[in-house]
Design a protein with these regions (language model features):
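Cys-dependent protein tyrosine phosphatase-like superfamily
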Residues: 22-249, 262-358
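Ser/Thr-glycine-rich phosphate-binding loops at phosphate-binding pockets of nucleotides
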Residues: 254, 258-259
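Bacterial N-terminal signal peptides that target proteins for export
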Residues: 2-10
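Bacterial N-terminal signal peptides
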Residues: 11-20
Length: 358
């Protein structure tokens, strides 16, 4: 595969991670991505710029910060660009350390986690900020609600060693679909869904079209930045200042809107480029298993089904609308975070210290 095609593929997967902490400008840029195939094996891919000759050794661990480097689990010529770690363990999350020519190394994991009953569970590790610092793997996760939790998924969550769960759903949502996971403290920080309940009622009556759904979603995202919701968002970010709250999971109904906006604010604090922030946001469209939701809408009219699709999708335009409104009203994202979300320079440094590689 030509380099341009290879680069586009890795970028498309949104798993783009470049070697951070290079000691000099002569060090190569290393791009990696880790994916799971249909049966759970790990597909590890890499590219070096410029191309390197030699060998890449790959070590495996259940945790991202400790590897036994006595014997690699995989070894390949660097120019091969891909290797597969075969496993029948679909419970324990695996991380991999790639060592190129015994000189350059990088840790990577599969960003999206395969779950039976939980939607959209992802690790934010590996994203690079503008200073080429990487977000630490296994520290901050995002997902949909934990209200229908299988035994296998409860075991998978146990392996994450969560210290804190932030639930952004409203009180009525929490009462209707309580969190079933009991091995980590849950902090309820309700964020309003605006007029979405009205949209759901119109869907049930088959009185909604896709244009209506788009307007509801635009209103929803503008509601996220109102004073009504600012307190919960500020409290969520305040909890990220405390290192004892990590590893942390942020969740809402599907993990795409309220969670998506909060995670976007976090990534700005970590100084991640906006292009990466938007790519992470729309990745929900790949991580949500829409086939599990299909039985709920199969009897609706085609118009209603199109409206539901719009409501369930992570549309970049919705997040951009909120960001543009913030910039228009406050001048910048940083000013909004300071004045409304109470993120001063001290808070920013504390959050960065908790989540960025040093």
């Amino acid at each position: 595969m030509k380099r341009t095609m290879w680069t586009k593929f890795i970028t498309y997967c949104f798993g783009l991670i470049c070697l951070a902490g290079c000691s000099s400008s002569s060090d190569p840029e290393i791009r990696t991505v880790c994916l799971r195939d249909a049966i759970g094996n790990y597909i590890i891919k890499w590219e070096t710029i410029p191309s390197l000759a030699g060998t890449v050794r790959i070590f495996e661990s259940d945790v991202p910060n400790q590897f036994d480097e006595t014997e690699p689990v995989l070894q390949a010529p660097i120019d091969r660009g891909v290797s597969t770690f075969i496993t029948n363990d679909n419970i324990t999350r695996k991380y991999f350390k790639l060592v190129f020519n015994n000189r350059y190394s990088q840790v990577i994991g599969a960003r999206t986690m395969a779950m039976d009953s939980v939607q959209n569970l992802r690790d934010l590790g590996g994203y690079l900020n503008k200073n080429r610092q990487s977000i630490r793997w296994g520290r901050i996760f995002r997902s949909g609600q934990l209200s229908t939790l299988s035994e296998w998924d409860a075991d998978r969550l146990d392996r994450l060693n969560l210290k804190c769960i932030l639930d952004l759903r409203t009180e009525s949502e929490q009462q209707r679909d309580p969190i079933r996971y009991t091995h980590a403290p849950v902090h309820h920080l309700p964020v309003s869904t605006g007029k979405l309940q009205e949209a759901h009622e119109r869907i049930a009556r088959d009185q909604i079209r896709i244009g209506d759904a788009l307007l509801y979603m635009q209103d929803y995202y503008l509601q996220l930045i109102t004073p009504e919701n600012s307190q919960s968002l500020a409290e969520a970010l305040a909890m990220m200042r405390d290192s004892t709250n990590f590893p942390m999971l942020v969740q809402c109904s599907l993990g795409k809107d309220r969670t998506g906006f909060l995670i976007a604010m976090l990534l700005y604090i970590l100084e991640v480029p906006e292009e990466t922030i938007l790519k992470d946001y729309v990745r929900s469209n790949e991580s949500i298993r829409f086939e599990l939701l299909a039985p709920l809408v199969q009897h609706f009219s085609m118009d209603a089904q199109e409206a539901v699709t719009a409501l369930l999708s992570a549309n970049e335009d919705f997040l951009l609308l909120a960001l543009e409104t913030i910039r228009k009203e406050y001048g910048s994202i940083a000013t909004y975070q300071h004045l409304v979300l109470h993120i001063d320079e001290k808070a920013r440094r504390e959050i960065q210290a908790n989540l960025l590689e040093h």
